[in-house]
């Protein structure tokens, strides 16, 4: 429990659920009337969209040129295989005191039928571990062969959304005129940075016909709920009951710390800009 005067962030309950997913319930406060709603909406969005994690960016399956292809002697379609691959969960295999900032590598799988293919059959780099080995990938009949390779990346919000942005416009910095008014630059189209994630994906799609593209943003937090409760009816103070479900690659306590840090950094930057402009 972290407590500063009348502020608190307490983990009330935590448990492991089915298929390795993690659940935790927190009490966060104290807020004045109306502040809890603002805080709850902000931290929920940060938890769902700004968490670091592994993701498969694209997959190559031998014999498949598109998502709707059917492989011989394989019960699942290519689309079903891709959806099953997305259920696999990866974590870095490093000491706890060591930071894991970036990673880009690949994994592969090659199995012959008959039999079932699971996530445990995937071959990975030494620094990556699959924590969902029981996830079903495909069912092979006699004579079937499943061979695939995928690109694996570790990404976080700071890498995906750098402050300079994916689109860069030279006119934005000059939008403020000498008299302090802001010019309307909506008719000027920004230029696309060649090193941006979106630009790289467009280039990859043009250069490869057998690449099957998957996610571009990691989502280790699967679900977030919050309820606002009254703490003291006399002074109108409130607190939040926050529930978090993750896929097992990230502890709910860690996700709360990440979200609070990201929100603090974001608002702090705008506070500095406001000071400089005055």
Curated annotation (Swiss-Prot):
SMART domains: RPOLD. GO terms for molecular function: DNA-directed RNA polymerase activity; protein dimerization activity. Coiled coil: none annotated. It is an enzyme of class 2 (transferase). The keyword Cytoplasm does not apply. Gene3D superfamilies: DNA-directed RNA polymerase, insert domain, RNA polymerase, RBP11-like subunit. Its EC number is 2.7.7.6. InterPro entries: DNA-dir_RNA_pol_insert, DNA-dir_RNA_pol_RpoA/D/Rpb3, RBP11-like, RNApol_insert_sf. It catalyses: RNA(n) + a ribonucleoside 5'-triphosphate = RNA(n+1) + diphosphate. Pfam families: RNA_pol_A_bac (PF01000), RNA_pol_L (PF01193). Keywords: Chloroplast, DNA-directed RNA polymerase, Nucleotidyltransferase, Plastid, Transcription, Transferase. One of its GO terms (cellular component) is chloroplast. Its main location: plastid. It is found in: Plastid, Chloroplast. DNA-dependent RNA polymerase catalyzes the transcription of DNA into RNA using the four ribonucleoside triphosphates as substrates. Belongs to the RNA polymerase alpha chain family. In plastids the minimal PEP RNA polymerase catalytic core is composed of four subunits: alpha, beta, beta', and beta''. When a (nuclear-encoded) sigma factor is associated with the core the holoenzyme is formed, which can initiate transcription. This is DNA-directed RNA polymerase subunit alpha. It comes from Chlorella vulgaris (Green alga).
């Amino acid at each position: 429990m972290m407590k500063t005067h009348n502020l608190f962030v307490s983990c009330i309950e935590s448990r492991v659920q089915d298929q390795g997913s993690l659940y935790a319930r927190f009490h966060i406060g104290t807020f004045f009337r109306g502040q809890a709603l603002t805080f709850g909406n902000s931290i929920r969005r940060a938890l769902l969209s700004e968490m670091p994690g592994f993701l498969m960016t694209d997959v190559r399956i031998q014999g498949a040129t598109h998502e709707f292809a059917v492989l011989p002697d394989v019960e699942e379609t290519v689309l079903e295989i891709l959806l099953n691959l997305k259920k696999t969960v990866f974590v870095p295999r490093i000491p706890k005191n060591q930071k894991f900032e970036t990673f880009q590598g690949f994994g592969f799988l090659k199995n012959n039928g008959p039999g079932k293919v699971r996530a445990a059959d995937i071959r990975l780099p030494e620094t990556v571990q699959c924590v969902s080995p029981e996830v079903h990938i495909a069912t092979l009949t006699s004579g079937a062969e499943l061979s695939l390779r995928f690109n694996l990346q570790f990404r976080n919000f700071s890498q995906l959304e750098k402050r300079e942005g994916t689109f860069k416009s030279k006119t934005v910095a000059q939008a403020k005129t000498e008299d302090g008014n802001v010019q309307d630059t909506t008719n000027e189209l920004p230029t696309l940075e060649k090193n941006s994630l979106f630009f790289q994906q467009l280039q990859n799609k043009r250069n490869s016909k057998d690449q099957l593209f998957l996610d571009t943003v990691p989502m280790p937090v699967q679900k977030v709920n919050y309820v606002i409760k009254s703490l003291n009816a006399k002074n109108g103070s409130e607190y939040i009951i926050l529930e978090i479900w993750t896929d097992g690659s990230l502890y709910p306590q860690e996700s709360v710390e990440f979200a609070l840090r990201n929100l603090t950094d974001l608002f702090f930057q705008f506070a500095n800009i406001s000071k400089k402009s005055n």
